Amino acid sequence: MSLQPTATEVGTMYDQYTSLLTDVMAGFIHVGYWDDPEREDTIEVATERLTREIGERLSSVRGQRILDVGCGTGKSAVQIATAHDVHITGITVSNHQIELAQSQYESNTKAGQVNFLFANAMDLPFADASFDGAYAIESLVHMDDRRTALTNIARVLRPGSRLAIADLFLDAGCPNPEVLARFHELFQVPPMPSGDDLKALLHQTGFKVIEFTDIRDTSGLSANF
């Protein structure tokens, strides 16, 4: 792979690996959140908890329109839409994920509550100020132009809307460069920003960071939202 994978390359990777990843992650495609080290929760409970944390940070109101940037199979969208009674549009660059999301969830939830489209966050097909909130769960990590993606997300959000992100970033000093290189190659990941770089980029694209929580010790991975 190149150091800057295209959306097509990322989509092809997920076409190949989505079924395997969802088998491991209890239907989701993101790490879990074990908030109590004394409690031995299952991966299903932990991944649902991470999704719930994201949904709660949106502070959404019933009936609002929310954008899911990198919706995977749609399971997170359904969980958040059901819990908060909002309408969610999910996008992905994987044809296989769109097929799964539409067949498994779109027709089995309240009419109009969730819908899924093939779309690239770096070229969103929505009008300005179309959504009341947005979230991205481990999807920005794949994008070769995060600045453009965040600028596009800001464009389609109404003033005052929230963006909740759960993602990976790289601390200074990689302990195992070979493992990291393999991760980049296998999962089509361009160079990752540091936490400070990500916060700076959010500010530069029009967002105000109101919370930054490090959950690496409770995720089984160096993951942060």
From Swiss-Prot:
It catalyses: desmethylrestrictinol + S-adenosyl-L-methionine = restrictinol + S-adenosyl-L-homocysteine + H(+). SUPFAM superfamilies: S-adenosyl-L-methionine-dependent methyltransferases. InterPro entries: Erg6_SMT_methyltransf (IPR050447), Methyltransf_11 (IPR013216), SAM-dependent_MTases_sf (IPR029063). CDD domains: AdoMet_MTases. Its EC number is 2.1.1.-. Pathway: Antifungal biosynthesis. S-adenosyl-L-methionine binds at Q97, H142. GO terms for biological process: methylation. It is an enzyme of class 2 (transferase). Keywords: Methyltransferase, S-adenosyl-L-methionine, Transferase. The keyword S-adenosyl-L-methionine applies. GO terms for molecular function: S-adenosylmethionine-dependent methyltransferase activity. Belongs to the methyltransferase superfamily. O-methyltransferase; part of the gene cluster that mediates the biosynthesis of the tetrahydropyranyl antifungal agent restricticin that acts as an inhibitor of CYP51 and blocks the ergosterol biosynthesis. Within the pathway, rstn1 uses S-adenosylmethionine to methylate position C4 of desmethylrestrictinol to produce restrictinol. The highly reducing polyketide synthase rstn3, the short chain dehydrogenase rstn4, the cyclase rstn5, the FAD-dependent monooxygenase rstn6 and the enoylreductase rstn7 are required to generate the first stable intermediate desmethylrestrictinol. This is O-methyltransferase rstn1. It comes from Aspergillus nomiae NRRL (strain ATCC 15546 / NRRL 13137 / CBS 260.88 / M93). The lineage of its organism: Eukaryota, Fungi, Dikarya, Ascomycota, Pezizomycotina. The gene is rstn1.
